[in-house]
Design a protein with these regions (language model features):
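Short glycine-/polar-rich loops that comprise or flank the Walker A/P-loop
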Residues: 2, 123-125, 195-197
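Conserved C-terminal RecA-like helicase domain
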Residues: 48-182
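A short beta-strand element within the Helicase C-terminal
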Residues: 192-202
Length: 202
């Protein structure tokens, strides 16, 4: 038998007797130590944190859902604060993010909650729901639009937004903070190369 371990740095093939747990552990641990060492030499590409969810085990299901959705809202505001850009024309703080949930029903419920809940003063949100059960024509148009808007190659802190729909929202919204939120299921990950300012991932 042989054990094959691979990552983005290398592939190791080690001879090993079938069922030899101690040999497997030794080879695997050596591979992981080398991987951690290699990753430590790479530049940091993304940073993340775990958002605490304060639901109590004694809460009702409805209270747990509300608490969960509220934690998502709080994370969005925090991420917007840290990762927004400035619109060149209006000087408003703008961010584009994704809330990625596992299933369609929670995707729709999170979207509805984010559209109806209270946000900090001076904050407006625009929410789009994106999942695989949408009417195909709608989904096709959504995907075309998302591919256009989220193919952003600029790293500038000030952006001159040209998209007609985005521009309309920026020009007509009185709030100084505008957060564009895509609430999506894993369909967002299939063949998409979108550039978001932030993400909340279930």
């Amino acid at each position: 038998c042989a054990l094959v371990l691979c990552d983005e740095f290398r592939t190791d093939v080690e001879p090993m007797d079938s069922g030899d747990d101690s040999a497997y552990r030794k080879i695997h641990d050596r591979f992981i130590r080398k991987r951690v060492e290699n990753l430590g030499k790479e530049p940091v590409k993304r940073k993340g944190y775990i958002q605490p969810c304060g639901a109590d085990d004694n809460d009702t299901d409805a209270a747990k859902k509300t608490s969960y959705f509220e934690n998502i809202r709080e994370a969005i505001e925090k991420l917007h604060e840290n990762h927004h850009v400035i619109d060149k024309k209006t000087k408003k703080r703008v961010s584009f993010g994704v809330v990625r949930v596992a299933n369609i029903t929670p995707c729709v419920k999170v979207s509805l909650y984010l559209m109806k809940c209270g946000w900090s003063e001076g904050t407006a949100v625009r929410v789009m729901t994106y999942h695989s059960r949408q009417i195909l024509l709608l989904r096709h148009e959504q995907e075309r639009y998302l591919d256009k808007v989220f193919t952003r190659k600029t790293q500038s802190a000030t952006v001159d937004f040209q998209d007609e729909t985005v521009r309309k929202h920026l020009d007509s919204t009185p709030e100084e903070n505008i957060i564009f939120i895509l609430v999506a299921t894993p369909v967002e990950e299939v063949g998409r190369d979108h550039d978001f300012d932030w993400a909340v991932v279930e």
